Structure formats: structure tokens, C-alpha cells
Swiss-Prot record:
The active site is at residue 318. Keywords: Cobalamin biosynthesis, Glycosyltransferase, Transferase. It is an enzyme of class 2 (transferase). Belongs to the CobT family. InterPro entries: Nict_dMeBzImd_PRibTrfase, Nict_dMeBzImd_PRibTrfase_bact, Nict_dMeBzImd_PRibTrfase_N, Nict_dMeBzImd_PRibTrfase_sf. It comes from Dehalococcoides mccartyi (strain ATCC BAA-2100 / JCM 16839 / KCTC 5957 / BAV1). This is Nicotinate-nucleotide--dimethylbenzimidazole phosphoribosyltransferase. Pfam families: DBI_PRT. PANTHER family: NICOTINATE-NUCLEOTIDE--DIMETHYLBENZIMIDAZOLE PHOSPHORIBOSYLTRANSFERASE. One of its GO terms (biological process) is cobalamin biosynthetic process.
Length: 352
């Protein structure tokens, strides 16, 4: 807990003075005030995070964390757990969707194994921080110990701290793990208080029969383990996943370093919900990249008071939505840096 506690102690609110200056600059640019809508709000929030009316967005990374889940033993999933490590290898060598979209936005990919079940060969492009070979089946007991949950969070903090040392203005979250919509739905239901019918989606394409099995399994896990909604680490340990804990740590660590976090889809959203429950202040540092088709994603975003930048009917994960949203965030910041003012352009201002 030492690293987690030290990280939490460094998190404080947005720089209001920088935000006022950023908005004042927006207001003298050659456009009606407020006419760029959310683009203006994005850059003002960035200014508050970085403490600079003209923030930076050049140095970007997407951290994709992987973990397997014991609940796949319940036999309602379409993909074998071996796919997790196979996709990790694709991430590491540039062939996956996240690699393509990261190249588009100029973000470096950071690939982390945190709870992968299948043994894998050493790879210089994969950071192997495996805590365990996947979670336990939460239908029969806690997914992990409390100590393992804290460790997952602290690994996430360590990973983002290392990226900050390399130079980091924006960090995106991404996930990989067969079965990870089930713990995400459990986390969402427990913390928001919404029913499993409301928050549980089809994941990678569950049939109606598989959906019944999925909801029943998650309901059993919640009933048996009885997680405390006010104790995010308890929730994570009982019905969570290692990659979810790791991404929660990335979010907390980024906030402690005054780095904006672009939160991807449902699994990243569950991680954000864990981080938010631990430290509500982290909301100020988060941008919701997109709204996934997973129904629980909209619910957890509403719970945290976050509005998604994009709505693209996506449900892949990996950090793909975060990469896309970085384009919008960077565009907002270019307006702040490059657009002419009324005085610069010789354009008459609105008459009062």
C-alpha cells in the first residue's frame, strides 16, 4: 500500500488560474465565443491538468494491460484463453488495431502482461509483470487476494511513472483479456447499484443463452463474495481482474503526475470506476474516449459524470477508442496554439 498511498497524496485539483487563462485565450480567437463547443472545454481541462494555458499534447502513449479470468470456466465465452497471449504478441509486433490507430495519432504502445494464464516466451516488446496466471473463478470465491489487488494497482502506477520519465503529455488506457466484460459488469453493478440486466452486454458476441449463463454467473459471484461498494479494493479483489487493477493504477499514477488520461471502453471504464471510488478527484484528469456498445459503459460514465468524446459503436478494447479520441484532443489543443486572434487577423469583433 505504500506506493498507492504516496500516489494518492500527490493528487490535487485542477489549476483554476490556468483554466481561466485558457478560456480567455479561446475567447479572443477569430470565432464566436463558445462556438467550438467541446473542443474548448477539452483544452481548458487540459490547461487545468497541466497548469498551463497552452498545454502540450505531443508526447502520447497507450498502455494496454492484459489478464485472464477464471470465470471463463463457466463456459459461456466464445474464445479460448490462449487468444489473450496471442493478441499480446500481435500488440508487441505492430499488427493489431491498436497499433494501427496508435501510429495514426503518434502514440507509443506499452504492452503489459499482468495476469496472463498461458505461458509466453520473453519478448522485449512485452512488459511481463504477471502477478498470477489469471484470476480465480469468482463464481466460487474471490478473484484474487486483497494484497494481489493492491499489487495490480501499484504495478499500473509503476508503469505510468516510467512512461512519465520518458516524456508524457497524454496517456490512453487499453485492455486485453478473454472474459473481461464479466468482471467489468460486476464492478459496474456493485459500485453504481444498477442491476446486472442493465449493465451486462454481449462482450465478444454472446448468444441469448450465453447471456443468461453470463448474468447468472456474475450474480452468483456477487452474492457469494459480497463486495463492499464503498471499498474499491475489496470490489477489485472479489470480482475484478488484474488488468483492471493495473489500469486503475495507471489512472491514479497519471493524475499524480498531472498527466491527462484518455479512458477507452467498458473494461477501461471499470478500471476508471475503481480509481474514482478510491479517489474521486481523478475524474478531473480523465477524458472518456468513447461510449462503447456495452450497456454498462454508459452507466458507469454517467456515475462518474463523464461525457464521451466519440460514439462509434465500438467494443474492441485494446485502447482503440483512446487512440481515436487523442486525435480530437490534439486538434483542440492545436486550436489553442495556432488559431489567430481578432487582433492578429485584423477581424472586427462582435459589437456589444
Amino acid at each position: 500500500m505504500e506506493l498507492l498511498n504516496a500516489t494518492l497524496a500527490k493528487i490535487y485539483g485542477l489549476d483554476k488560474e490556468a483554466m481561466v487563462k485558457a478560456q480567455a485565450h479561446q475567447d479572443i480567437l477569430i470565432k464566436p465565443q463558445g462556438s467550438l463547443g467541446k473542443l474548448e472545454a477539452i483544452v481548458v481541462q487540459l490547461a487545468g491538468i497541466q497548469g498551463d494555458a497552452k498545454p502540450k499534447t505531443a508526447k502520447k502513449a497507450i498502455i494496454t494491460m492484459a489478464g485472464d479470468h477464471g470465470i471463463i470456466d463457466e463456459k459461456f465465452h466464445n474464445w479460448p484463453k490462449e487468444v489473450t497471449v496471442q493478441m499480446l504478441q500481435n500488440f508487441a509486433h505492430g499488427g493489431a488495431a491498436i497499433n494501427v490507430l496508435s501510429r495514426q495519432v503518434g502514440a507509443r504502445n506499452v504492452v503489459v502482461a499482468l495476469g496472463v494464464a498461458t505461458p509466453m516466451a520473453a519478448d522485449p516488446n512485452i512488459i511481463n509483470r504477471n502477478i498470477a496466471p489469471g484470476t480465480n473463478n469468482m463464481v466460487h470465491g474471490p478473484a484474487m487476494t486483497r494484497e494481489q489487488a493492491v499489487k495490480a494497482i501499484e504495478v499500473g502506477i509503476e508503469i505510468v511513472n516510467a512512461e512519465v520519465k520518458k516524456g508524457l503529455d497524454l496517456v490512453g488506457t487499453g485492455d486485453m483479456g478473454i472474459g473481461n466484460t464479466s468482471p467489468s459488469a460486476a464492478i459496474c453493478s456493485v459500485i453504481t447499484g444498477r442491476s446486472l440486466e442493465d449493465v451486462t452486454g454481449r462482450g465478444t458476441g454472446a448468444s441469448d443463452e450465453q447471456m443468461k449463463l453470463k448474468r447468472n454467473a456474475i450474480a452468483k459471484a456477487i452474492s457469494l463474495n459480497n463486495p463492499d461498494a464503498k471499498d474499491a479494493i475489496d470490489v477489485l479483489s472479489k470480482v475484478g481482474g488484474y488488468e483492471i487493477g493495473g489500469l486503475a493504477g495507471v489512472i491514479l499514477g497519471a493524475a499524480a503526475n498531472r498527466v491527462a488520461v484518455v479512458v477507452d471502453g467498458f473494461i477501461s471504464g471499470a478500471a476508471a470506476l475503481i480509481a474514482y471510488t478510491i479517489c474521486p478527484q481523478v475524474k478531473d484528469f480523465m477524458f472518456a474516449a468513447h461510449q462503447s456498445v456495452e450497456p454498462g459503459h454508459r452507466i458507469l460514465l454517467e456515475h462518474m459524470g463523464l461525457d464521451a468524446i466519440l460514439k462509434m459503436d465500438m467494443r474492441l478494447g485494446e485502447g482503440t477508442g483512446a487512440a481515436l479520441a487523442m486525435n480530437i484532443i490534439e486538434a483542440a489543443n492545436r486550436i489553442q496554439h495556432e488559431m489567430a486572434s481578432f487582433a492578429d487577423a485584423g477581424v472586427s469583433e462582435k459589437q456589444s
